[in-house]
Design a protein with these regions (language model features):
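Hydrophobic targeting segments
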Residues: 1-4, 26-29
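Conserved donor NDP-sugar-binding/catalytic core segment of glycosyltransferases
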Residues: 35, 65-110
Length: 146
Protein backbone atom coordinates (compact mmCIF):
# COMPACT_ATOMS: atom_id res chain seq x y z
CA UNK A 1 0.00 0.00 0.00
CA UNK A 2 1.56 3.28 -1.06
CA UNK A 3 0.46 6.72 0.00
CA UNK A 4 1.90 10.23 0.08
CA UNK A 5 2.28 12.17 3.31
CA UNK A 6 4.29 15.02 4.76
CA UNK A 7 7.70 13.98 6.10
CA UNK A 8 7.49 13.25 9.81
CA UNK A 9 3.68 13.17 9.72
CA UNK A 10 3.01 9.82 8.04
CA UNK A 11 2.07 8.18 11.36
CA UNK A 12 -0.49 10.95 11.95
CA UNK A 13 -2.48 10.09 8.83
CA UNK A 14 -5.87 8.42 9.09
CA UNK A 15 -4.73 5.67 6.72
CA UNK A 16 -1.70 4.79 8.84
CA UNK A 17 -3.71 4.72 12.06
CA UNK A 18 -6.42 2.45 10.64
CA UNK A 19 -4.11 -0.06 8.92
CA UNK A 20 -1.06 -0.34 11.19
CA UNK A 21 -2.47 -3.38 13.02
CA UNK A 22 -3.20 -5.23 9.76
CA UNK A 23 -0.29 -7.55 8.85
CA UNK A 24 -1.45 -7.60 5.19
CA UNK A 25 -1.18 -3.83 4.84
CA UNK A 26 2.53 -3.17 4.28
CA UNK A 27 2.93 0.57 3.87
CA UNK A 28 5.40 2.55 1.80
CA UNK A 29 5.19 6.30 2.22
CA UNK A 30 6.34 8.83 -0.35
CA UNK A 31 7.16 11.91 1.73
CA UNK A 32 6.40 14.63 -0.78
CA UNK A 33 5.17 17.32 1.65
CA UNK A 34 2.45 18.30 -0.84
CA UNK A 35 5.11 19.51 -3.28
CA UNK A 36 4.03 17.15 -6.06
CA UNK A 37 0.60 16.52 -7.46
CA UNK A 38 -0.95 13.19 -6.58
CA UNK A 39 -0.76 11.85 -10.14
CA UNK A 40 3.02 12.38 -10.09
CA UNK A 41 3.30 10.57 -6.76
CA UNK A 42 1.17 7.70 -8.11
CA UNK A 43 3.34 7.47 -11.25
CA UNK A 44 6.46 7.43 -9.06
CA UNK A 45 4.90 4.63 -7.00
CA UNK A 46 4.07 2.63 -10.15
CA UNK A 47 7.68 3.00 -11.36
CA UNK A 48 8.91 1.84 -7.93
CA UNK A 49 6.56 -1.17 -7.97
CA UNK A 50 7.77 -2.18 -11.45
CA UNK A 51 11.44 -1.90 -10.41
CA UNK A 52 10.87 -3.89 -7.22
CA UNK A 53 8.62 -6.47 -8.93
CA UNK A 54 5.78 -5.76 -6.49
CA UNK A 55 2.96 -8.27 -6.93
CA UNK A 56 0.14 -5.92 -5.95
CA UNK A 57 0.10 -2.16 -5.69
CA UNK A 58 -2.56 -0.26 -3.76
CA UNK A 59 -2.55 3.53 -4.15
CA UNK A 60 -4.65 5.31 -1.58
CA UNK A 61 -5.26 8.81 -0.20
CA UNK A 62 -3.76 9.30 3.27
CA UNK A 63 -7.09 10.42 4.77
CA UNK A 64 -8.85 7.12 3.96
CA UNK A 65 -10.14 4.73 6.62
CA UNK A 66 -9.88 1.15 5.37
CA UNK A 67 -12.40 -0.68 7.49
CA UNK A 68 -12.11 -4.03 5.79
CA UNK A 69 -8.94 -4.27 3.72
CA UNK A 70 -8.91 -7.83 2.44
CA UNK A 71 -6.47 -9.54 0.12
CA UNK A 72 -9.12 -12.24 -0.52
CA UNK A 73 -11.65 -9.64 -1.64
CA UNK A 74 -9.07 -8.13 -4.00
CA UNK A 75 -8.10 -11.58 -5.32
CA UNK A 76 -11.74 -12.24 -6.22
CA UNK A 77 -12.09 -8.87 -7.98
CA UNK A 78 -8.79 -9.30 -9.84
CA UNK A 79 -10.26 -12.37 -11.55
CA UNK A 80 -12.62 -10.00 -13.37
CA UNK A 81 -10.82 -6.61 -13.39
CA UNK A 82 -7.21 -5.49 -14.00
CA UNK A 83 -7.51 -2.34 -11.89
CA UNK A 84 -9.82 -1.98 -8.89
CA UNK A 85 -11.24 1.22 -7.44
CA UNK A 86 -14.16 2.17 -5.26
CA UNK A 87 -15.81 4.64 -7.67
CA UNK A 88 -15.67 5.45 -11.36
CA UNK A 89 -17.54 6.35 -14.53
CA UNK A 90 -18.48 4.48 -17.70
CA UNK A 91 -18.25 7.62 -19.86
CA UNK A 92 -15.88 10.57 -19.70
CA UNK A 93 -15.77 14.05 -21.16
CA UNK A 94 -12.30 15.43 -20.39
CA UNK A 95 -12.54 18.96 -19.01
CA UNK A 96 -11.52 21.20 -16.14
CA UNK A 97 -11.83 20.88 -13.28
CA UNK A 98 -10.47 17.35 -13.67
CA UNK A 99 -12.84 15.66 -11.24
CA UNK A 100 -13.93 12.16 -12.21
CA UNK A 101 -17.59 12.61 -11.24
CA UNK A 102 -17.93 15.90 -13.16
CA UNK A 103 -16.26 14.47 -16.27
CA UNK A 104 -18.51 11.42 -15.93
CA UNK A 105 -21.73 13.40 -16.17
CA UNK A 106 -22.47 14.09 -12.49
CA UNK A 107 -25.19 12.47 -10.40
CA UNK A 108 -28.24 11.20 -12.23
CA UNK A 109 -26.33 10.63 -15.48
CA UNK A 110 -26.30 6.85 -14.99
CA UNK A 111 -22.56 6.86 -15.74
CA UNK A 112 -21.25 6.89 -12.15
CA UNK A 113 -20.69 3.64 -10.26
CA UNK A 114 -19.35 2.56 -6.88
CA UNK A 115 -19.59 3.98 -3.39
CA UNK A 116 -17.53 6.05 -0.97
CA UNK A 117 -18.16 6.83 2.69
CA UNK A 118 -17.34 10.31 3.98
CA UNK A 119 -16.88 11.46 7.54
CA UNK A 120 -14.58 10.37 10.34
CA UNK A 121 -14.12 7.39 12.64
CA UNK A 122 -17.26 8.29 14.63
CA UNK A 123 -19.74 9.45 11.98
CA UNK A 124 -20.00 8.43 8.34
CA UNK A 125 -22.39 8.84 5.47
CA UNK A 126 -22.30 6.75 2.32
CA UNK A 127 -22.44 8.17 -1.18
CA UNK A 128 -23.60 5.46 -3.58
CA UNK A 129 -22.98 6.43 -7.19
CA UNK A 130 -24.50 3.40 -8.88
CA UNK A 131 -24.15 -0.32 -9.52
CA UNK A 132 -20.84 -1.96 -8.61
CA UNK A 133 -18.63 -3.79 -9.24
CA UNK A 134 -18.78 -2.44 -12.78
CA UNK A 135 -16.32 -2.04 -15.65
CA UNK A 136 -15.56 1.69 -16.03
CA UNK A 137 -13.25 3.88 -18.12
CA UNK A 138 -12.14 6.30 -15.37
CA UNK A 139 -11.60 5.66 -11.65
CA UNK A 140 -11.46 8.01 -8.69
CA UNK A 141 -7.90 8.09 -7.32
CA UNK A 142 -9.00 7.74 -3.69
CA UNK A 143 -8.29 3.97 -3.83
CA UNK A 144 -6.67 2.11 -6.71
CA UNK A 145 -5.46 -1.49 -6.59
CA UNK A 146 -3.31 -2.68 -9.49
Amino acid sequence: MIFSASAGKETDTTLFKTTQADPQAEQIVFKENNKQSLHKVYNKAIDFALQEDVERLVLVHDDVILESYSERKLDKLFKKFDVIGCAGTTEVNLKLPALWHLMGGWFGSGNLHGAVAHGDEERKHMTAFGEYPKRVVLLDGVFLAI
